[in-house]
Amino acid sequence: MFNKVTKTFQYGQHTVTLETGEIARQASGAVLVSIEDTVVLATVVARKDAKPGQDFFPLTVDYVEKTYAAGRIPGGFFKREGRPSEKETLTSRLIDRPIRPLFPEGYLNEVQIIIHVMSVNPEIDPDIAAMIGASAALSVSGIPFAGPLGAARVGYIDGQYILNPTATQLKTSQMDLVVAGTEAAVLMVESEAQQLSEEVMLGAVVFGHDQMKAVIDAIHDLVRDGGKPEVQWAPPAKNEALIARVAHFAEEKLRAAYQTKDKQARTAKLKDAFAEVNAEVAAEATSVGGAAPDTSEVGNILFDLEAKIVRSQILDGEPRIDGRDTRTVRPITIRTGVLPRTHGSALFTRGETQALVIATLGTARDEQKIDALMGEYSDRFMLHYNMPPFATGETGRVGTPKRREIGHGRLAKRALIAALPAPEDFSYSVRLVSEITESNGSSSMASVCGGCLALMDAGVPMQAHVAGIAMGLIKDGGKFAVLSDILGDEDHLGDMDFKVAGTANGITALQMDIKIQGITKEIMQVALAQAKEGRIHILGEMEKAVPSGTTGELSDFAPRLITIKINPEKIRDVIGKGGAVIRALTEETGTQIDISDEGVVTIASVDAAAGQEAKRRIEELTASVEVGKVYEGTVLKLLDFGAIVQVMPGKDGLLHISQIANERVNAVADYLKEGQQVRVKVLETDDRGRLKLSMKAALAEDNPEAAPQE
């Protein structure tokens, strides 16, 4: 009944199993991938033909985590999985990016890839299994696809590269890098690092690419034994006559438009040129009795012509679209403290790209609690990236962040997290929001620069300035050019775009997307060296605006955090019965108080005086009474045989009638009254913490001559 095919191979320290032919047989392709108890099912379905009039490739990738994979039932009223988590969105993008360039040009049939996480080992992140599964499912499906694709995670511990490190190993790794590619070329890199050099980062890319050959070989074997016949598909024939006529009408117009340096003016000229060319081509066709060509077909030809013009100009050494050479970074302006009531803010402008970044400080209660499939955890640093449509002079939907915004926010967060102070040095939780107010390329890297400056403005003691730069690469045969600080137009016309962020000491985040084969290690080396040059220039501009070591003062509107350590056994004294003591403390002082199991008390208050008052009262509550020490006490209650005296809040003891005075005391009321302040010495304390007090002993200590003579 089943034509099940299984392939197993060793991949680093893990055994990987690929299975096809048993599950999801009606999909175009389906592969079950297992890595040490982490199991994913990857399926792909392609439509038999393209929708009429469609002029783009509709590829969708959905990575879906099921809570049953971790042996849990979802929370909430409906007890079902909800909308995609940030992790699911980011992993979907991670799979999409290296796969998309491997479909042939002109293939417009809808393709849907769905990856379900069926079982998860908390030590093995499912993302690598998902990437391998998507590649294998496409390969066995027979769909036109220039794969297979391999994927690997690379760590860096004690100067050694680690292939597919576990979650435990990643905690001590200086790098978390994911690389994907075919047998011939690297196609995608996504990484964060602890300020590592370009050489170490490139070495990790090459190491990962070499190791993933094991994956590619296993998929080839799987296709040989369990693959479906190749789908017969041929790219649509190019209308060479139409291409020639469009080029005849459009080339000069497009070249003229690309002499305009301002983005909005250039966009307007290009729009006019497109309209004129469409009209001229249509008029020529109808004048000879033919039908006007499809406008989308003309548009695609114009796009190809645009790319050819811009690319050839750059490769011939001519100025770029905005007049720069290949290495120059656009003019940078920086302003901090932009918004009066926020905790920190910075306006970072680079050419026609601008980010207004706001920092907000909070307490441990403000940390983001994340119920992840691999285990629940809290995150003290959040970064949210928003790009409204007005940033590009357009109208559009405003609302839930799209995949692109989530991805850009995650990249900026990766870049900054390595330079944040340790929690023990700065116990605040931090939220950064990057509002992109103008965009013409490299907005995620503007978020990195603006984010670092906003954090410094908020008083966060950053380890160093962090800057980011977006780079491009254009290659034609043996000629290539690396572009620093790319524009939006250069982004989609190039063969490789990559973003590098870091400090003067090294890289903290690296993202690469390569659209063609033939990008060698040497080319990547040149590109990374030029990116470093650009990053150092931007760091210099940031240093001028906010010199190192000049972290801003905390805003008057930010909470002040006071941290004290108490004996864990005293925690109950601060909390009180049913939380009565701590509730009264927070209400009376207007502060927020958090106590860890280890006895670390964090007091948060916008009013510094209120925070100090809360600290004083907690210290009183947790202070230990010392035997043999004299205290100023308050008489709380008179008894027939003595009095109850409070020596400090929550600490009272018995002053026996025999210890009130040197002479005989017949009535306690003759010597004491409730509320009276008296000096008492602590004689002893029993195992239940009860105190025995003495006024006589205190008097003798204050005035030895008054002590009774033996």
Curated annotation (Swiss-Prot):
Residues where Mg(2+) binds: D491, D497
Domain of life: Bacteria
Compartments where located: Cytoplasm
GO CC field: cytosol
UniProt KW Metal-binding keyword: yes
Required cofactor(s): Mg(2+)
Stretches assigned to the S1 motif domain: 628-696
Protein name in UniProt: Polyribonucleotide nucleotidyltransferase
Gene: pnp
